[in-house]
Design a protein with these regions (language model features):
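Catalytic cores of TIM-barrel enzymes
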Residues: 1-200
């Protein structure tokens, strides 16, 4: 508890410029360092969640930074991204070598004439335009109608029918499978974060 309080005070003083901290806070965006120090590749920790947890737990204990080294910034659930055919980024073993970090794919994912669509209804825009563009597995969602079409009785059947479309069904199946994989990842990673927070 005393160590946690010292770190919190150090960070608060430095961030809010409230006097001089006892030392410079150590805040690391460690990337894949916790993995590589254990002899693992970035690919390994996008596939084996137990190894991810072990590597990040040990790195936090050894490095003793003032903030958490969290795997959520690097060790993504690779299989979930593969299931959805995510195109907005490449990750270790999928578009970049297994030893490389993830890379964003710079492309015009949002068109210049779509800002009004985004501003008018962000959820509708993301569901019908953006997500189908950035993930091949979600292309079917572009065929869905707005949930607002279900408000009146005459709009109900056409809205419901879209959910039976084979492309929509395929996207739903992929999203469900990716959700299960992300839950398997989260079932390992989030308890680690809870443990590290509890340790102070």
């Amino acid at each position: 508890a005393a160590e946690y309080k010292a770190r919190a005070t150090r960070l608060k003083k430095a961030i809010l410029l409230e006097g001089e901290p006892d030392r410079t806070p150590v805040c690391l965006l460690a990337g894949y360092y916790p993995a590589t120090r254990k002899g693992l590749t970035p690919y390994d920790v996008t596939q084996d969640y137990d190894k991810t947890v072990d590597a990040w737990l040990e790195a936090n204990h050894v490095v003793q930074a003032d903030t958490l080294l969290a795997p959520v910034f690097a060790a993504i659930p690779g299989r979930a991204y593969e299931i959805l055919d995510v195109e907005i980024l490449n990750w270790p073993g999928h578009g970049v070598p297994k030893e490389a970090s993830f890379q964003y794919n710079e492309k015009e994912w949002m068109q210049a004439d779509e800002y009004d669509l985004l501003i008018d209804d962000p959820t509708d825009y993301l569901l019908h335009y953006y997500l189908p563009r950035v993930a091949g597995g979600l292309r079917g969602f572009a065929k869905l109608m707005s949930p607002l079409d279900m408000v009146e009785i005459v709009g109900g059947p056409p809205w419901m029918m879209r959910w039976a479309d084979p492309d929509v069904q395929a996207s739903l199946e992929k999203l469900t499978a990716a959700g299960r994989e992300a839950a398997a990842w989260g079932g390992k990673v989030y308890p680690l974060l809870g443990r590290l927070v509890a340790e102070g």
